[in-house]
Amino acid sequence: MDSTLDETNELEKISEDDVGTVPEDAFVILDGTRVVPLNQVVVNIGRRIENTIVVDDPRVSRTHAQLRAINGRYIIFDLNSTGGTFVNGKKVDQSILYSGDVISLAGADFIYGQKNPPPRPDLKETLPL
């Protein structure tokens, strides 16, 4: 697995105090209707019943991906899944998640959300017309 993030989602340096800081009011939307609050430092996603989020889809690996709370943000890690992990249509090994990101695990889609999210560093502020 590649140990670096893509250049648009680089991690900032992390202190030990920041590891495990769960983002406030984070959630994922499954199947377009089911809202699952995220309130754990580590969230495992896959077909196995032991996962935090169980996805009943044969395309999804038993232990497909993992969300980790680091520096007040969730970062998704692909766990060497067969079908891959995608964020906004781009295949990733790991990626910082931002509110509104679409996560696809081998075709099973989720939407990551967060109330009052921090700003995205890759989006420039625009002035009103």
Descriptions of predicted regions:
Residues R34-D109:
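Forkhead-associated
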Residues M1-A26, A108-L129:
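Regulatory inter-domain linker segments that are low-complexity and enriched
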Residues D25-L30, G83-T85:
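Short polybasic amphipathic segments
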Residues N9-D17, D31-R34, S61-A65:
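Short small/polar-residue motifs
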